[in-house]
Amino acid sequence: MRALKILTFTFLIFHASGQEVSLLKLCTHCTCSEIPDIDGTHLVLNILCSELDKVDDLADLDKIQWPDNPNGLKISATFEGLGLTTLGKLPPNTQVETLRFSSNAITTYWPNPFSDLPNLKILSFSQNEIAALTPDLFTNAKNIEDLDLSYNKLTHISPLDFKNLQRVKKLNLQNNALGKFPVEALQSMKVLEDLDLGKNGIIDVLLKRAKSEGLKGVKRLNLSGNRIRSIVKDSFPDENNIELLDLSNNVIEVIEEEAFLTCTSLRELNLAQNNITFTFALPSTLQIAILRINTLYHWPQFPPGITYIDLSYNRLSALYDETNVYFDNLEVLNIGGNQIKEFELQNKLPRLFSLDISYNIIAEVPKCISSQNFPTLEELRLDGNPIESIYFKNIIALKNLYMNDMNRLTVVEDKAFSNVIGRAGDEIEFEKTCFSLFLSNCASLREIQGAFDGTNLCMLDVSKNNLTHLSRTLLEWRNLNEGANLQFNPWNCNCDMQWVIKDLLPQMYKTNSLLLSELRCGSPRAYEGLRLVHWYNWTEEAMCTDVYDSGNYQIAPSTIKSSQISSLTLILAGCIIAALLVATALSVYLVWNRRRHKVRQAALKRKRQSALDVREASGHEQFSALNKV
């Protein structure tokens, strides 16, 4: 019996070895190419297998055959959108450095699937169905530096799962179902720098008490889109190197006064879209502060090195106290969407290039807006304020000026923008400067007078207003190198607007024809809704005709002489007359035929009635005879 078992086992071995294993050549079914790497420093052999490739049996990744690589290039392979549910063990290759299995349905995997890929550094399982990890997934993948497990279904991570990943610098766990910060699981990642835990279900951050080597080197920490309600003194460890901290899109209501002071390297802090009401202390190293969409009533105390402040859509009612701040390094200030009535500054902001005070309740253009106070300003936003009259009192140099959504503005008066000049860039230092003006969606704006005397515009946007007339002398239209957006206005297409077709329309057609698609007439009635581009290249002055009176139009008498009537016109007229004659004859025939049909029907009806009367009379006589008998 024992000899029989040995013979059977030997037969199976020889039978299996005699069969040839069919390997799947990747470059036959997928796209293989030599491309520069992400840094552009050297070439890599890129293999892309996507849902567009008709690949059979690719679920058995252990049966793939790596392509020949005579130049010894590093290999980057992507298996994307193939519907993979199980990850098999990949065949050996020492040149594979990047593997991506994104947008599949992977739930399980073979033990040690990467044990024969000793130089694997970048691994992505983004957008799969992984609900749990086991230590044997990364047992022999000790060189991984970038691991992406985002958009899976992980609820818990054990310290043993990552115990072999000691060289990971970037870890992405975004959009899973983690209920708490996986501090213990990061213990082995001693060189971790970038950690993304956004869009999970984390409710608190208490890292100060955690003794984890994996958190000491973290420079970028993303906790956005969680359920964090408060930030306290114990939220971050004393010795941390966090430079970028994102806590946006949480439900934070309380931040303790000194909660961020342990972050001595913090440069960027994002607290947008929370419920923060009270201010707190900020570290002295902070340069970028994003606090938009909160409920702050007062300005935080920003450090001297601050360069970017976004306090838009809070509840601020006044500016900061100039005696207690130092904004010499400030480059961007966004306080739009607040309740500020007055914008008056005494101190200069020497480096500010973008100022947004839109959607407040400022009733006039601030008098402090000048090149003296803002010597480097490039972009100014005044949108949505209840400004009724525009006038810049002092000279200001800009590249872009935004004054949209001003519902109380009815007329832009003379010299409104005379003190606004263009700001030269480095590339056009010695050329004539210009600025772009966006004055759109002002529902009551019906007239623009000599507002641009002494100015030079690059682009003018007066779309979606209530303008009916446009003066030829309003500005130097030829200098608008970026075009003019005149769309969605009820233009009165009369002779005074003929110059638009003659001069402005050809210029816009060549430079930016997209700005002509909704450039239409609003009056007179005959032209209502007609696009002005309809008259492009017309030799006649279409808007200067006298045939339209009070919105009602008449057909103008023909000016064509009889000798100029072409044969085609005669043929067409003859066809129309013949068609009318045929139609008339057919109508007469149908009427006559219908009358004849009615007469025949009436005669037939009378005949049937007579026959019926005869039968009834005969029956009555027979009945009478029987009674007599």
Locations of regions flagged by a protein language model:
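Extracellular leucine-rich repeat
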Residues: 2-629
